[in-house]
Curated annotation (Swiss-Prot):
<keyword id="KW-0808">Transferase</keyword>
<dbReference type="GO" id="GO:0103068">
    <property type="term" value="F:leukotriene C4 gamma-glutamyl transferase activity"/>
</dbReference>
<keyword id="KW-1133">Transmembrane helix</keyword>
<keyword id="KW-0472">Membrane</keyword>
<feature type="compositionally biased region" description="Acidic residues">
    <location>
        <begin position="20"/>
        <end position="32"/>
    </location>
</feature>
<keyword id="KW-0865">Zymogen</keyword>
<feature type="region of interest" description="Disordered">
    <location>
        <begin position="83"/>
        <end position="105"/>
    </location>
</feature>
<keyword id="KW-0378">Hydrolase</keyword>
<dbReference type="InterPro" id="IPR052688">
    <property type="entry name" value="Gamma-glutamyltransfase"/>
</dbReference>
<feature type="glycosylation site" description="N-linked (GlcNAc...) asparagine">
    <location>
        <position position="370"/>
    </location>
</feature>
<keyword id="KW-0812">Transmembrane</keyword>
<keyword id="KW-0325">Glycoprotein</keyword>
<dbReference type="InterPro" id="IPR029055">
    <property type="entry name" value="Ntn_hydrolases_N"/>
</dbReference>
<feature type="region of interest" description="Disordered">
    <location>
        <begin position="19"/>
        <end position="52"/>
    </location>
</feature>
<comment type="similarity">
    <text>Belongs to the gamma-glutamyltransferase family.</text>
</comment>
<protein>
    <recommendedName>
        <fullName>Glutathione hydrolase 6</fullName>
        <ecNumber>3.4.19.13</ecNumber>
        <ecNumber>2.3.2.2</ecNumber>
    </recommendedName>
</protein>
<dbReference type="GO" id="GO:0016020">
    <property type="term" value="C:membrane"/>
</dbReference>
């Protein structure tokens, strides 16, 4: 007998470190009752099930998905389509629960509605993350989209392997317009590590594009700052003024592209239909050879506390590892959170999301159009905004997801993931955050130590605009925190 669905509650997410003060949580025995979904959905072991652990339904479905830039909008979209709603704020925990540092812990799932649906349907963190990224491509065209470049980092707790996802080098489709890479990149990731059928992941974003979504505050602000030139009629009123927060936007052309992509059997074909339509719009030939996305072993750096993983060049991952290694070797005080590092002429607009389950499987995704609304060139036949990422040799300074695993030999080792969105300054602050985490957790420390609260003295906002996500798995718990504190609502089940 399934447990009745309870009202959804959203909470503010707090910066977290192992030494922070305790916070009560729902008792494990009570929470596990809500995790017994349809057991038949989790019995198929014929495919690669990223992060799945046999024999424990709670650990299979205990997943967390946090969307940095777009989860608040995804929450509102699905709420306005008749889903259960909740109130902002925190809920007093029941007495008698065990304690953790402040933040969000759960034995079950704490996710966005888009990701929640895919997990309930039997998906894993890769399904949830890819599905949510495609929803963001619809509802946050200023930060991401089908025209964006994606980087990803996936850690599979069952194998201990970490894999980097790249879109391939940037390539010009037409002067000032970058070749779109999102669909083949996400399709490749899902084909290797996902569990649900690919078409299932496109149901949500296709519905949002076809039936419409409500413009949220970040998108409305971006429209005011950028102006509507090149963005009409998608994001404009009939008189040419930008849509404000709460206005409804539809993108039926994009919905048609997504329906076509749902039928693609391979990652190469996933973007071909879109590319043909774009070439027709622009009056150019389809490139004879286009960069293909890749999955490759992640860059590694052994540290006393475990092993760090990140994405390879031309992302900022290798440079960040070098900075971390130098800081750890020197033994000097933790550097300024905003060092003069990875200077770029452009401060790109980017989007990030993270997914983690309580077994320690982690997916980090970050994407960018290079600047707000990319090139601001709206393809009339596809509804896609193209990026202006056209330089092959340019370092993607906005892309540097990091994962710290306590030990490769221990399948139950703690896992920490960090991913940032915004300007390169936020990535520098992420380096500072990880150094503080390593300093607070020496190699001999095996468990959380509940001490008085030690609020971080610096936040990424001191460097620039953006969001920093921190996700973790510890003793069969999924945990998340973020800076700014209230950037990212979540939904539990």
């Amino acid at each position: 007998m399934e447990r009745a669905e309870e009202p959804v509650v959203y909470q503010k997410l707090l910066p977290w470190e192992p030494s922070l003060e305790s916070e009560e949580e729902v008792e494990e025995e009570e929470t596990s009752e809500a995790l017994v979904l349809n057991p038949r959905r989790h019995q198929d072991s014929s495919r690669n099930k990223a992060g799945g652990l046999p024999g424990t339904w709670a650990r299979v479905v205990a997943a967390l998905l946090l969307l940095a830039v777009g989860c608040s909008l995804a929450v509102r979209q699905l709420q306005n389509q008749g889903r259960s709603t909740g109130s902002l704020g925190s809920v007093a925990p029941p007495p008698g629960g065990h304690s953790h540092g402040p933040g969000v812990y759960h034995h079950g799932a704490i996710i966005s509605p888009a990701g929640r649906e895919l997990l309930v349907a039997g998906g894993n963190v890769v399904d949830a993350g890819v599905g949510a990224a495609l929803c963001l491509a619809v509802v946050h065209p200023h930060a991401t989209g089908l025209g964006a470049m994606f980087w990803g980092l996936f850690h599979d707790s069952s194998s201990g392997n970490s894999t980097a996802l790249t879109s391939g080098p940037a390539q010009t489709l037409a002067p000032g317009l970058g070749l779109p890479a999102a669909l083949p990149t996400l399709h490749l990731l899902h084909a290797r590590f996902g569990r649900l059928p690919w078409p299932r992941l496109l149901v949500g974003p296709t519905t949002l594009a076809q039936e419409g979504f409500l413009v949220d505050t970040p998108l409305a602000r971006a429209l005011v700052a950028r102006g509507t030139e090149g963005l009409c009629p998608l994001l404009c009123h009939a008189d040419g003024t930008p849509l404000g927060a709460g206005a409804r936007a539809t993108n039926p052309q994009l919905a048609a592209v997504l329906r076509s992509a749902a039928l693609a059997p391979t990652s190469d074909l996933a973007g071909d239909a879109l590319l043909s339509l774009l070439a027709g719009d622009l009056g150019v030939e389809v490139p004879s050879a286009v960069p293909r996305p890749t999955l490759e072993p992640a860059e590694q750096l052994p540290v006393p506390q475990g092993i760090l993983f990140t994405t390879p060049s031309p992302s900022a991952g290798p440079e960040l590892l070098a900075l971390l290694e130098a800081a750890l070797r020197s033994g000097a005080p933790i550097p300024d959170p905003c060092p003069p590092f990875l200077q770029t002429a452009v401060s790109p607009e980017s989007s990030a999301l993270a997914a983690v389950d309580s077994s320690g499987s982690v997916l980090l995704l970050t994407s960018s159009l290079n600047c707000s609304f990319g090139s601001a060139h709206l393809s009339p036949s596809t509804g896609v905004l193209l990026s202006n990422l056209v330089a092959k040799s340019t370092t993607s300074a906005w892309a540097c997801p990091l994962i710290l695993r306590g030990s490769l030999d221990d399948t139950e080792a703690d896992v920490l993931g960090l991913v940032a969105s915004g300007t390169p300054d936020v990535a520098r602050a992420m380096t500072h955050t990880l150094l503080r985490h390593l300093a607070a957790r020496p190699p001999t420390q095996a468990q959380h130590q509940h001490q008085g609260q030690q609020e971080p003295t610096e936040h990424p906002s001191t460097c620039g605009q953006g969001t920093l996500l921190q996700v973790a798995a510890h003793t069969e718990h999924a945990h998340v925190s973020s800076v700014p504190h209230a950037c990212c609502p979540f939904q539990g089940f």
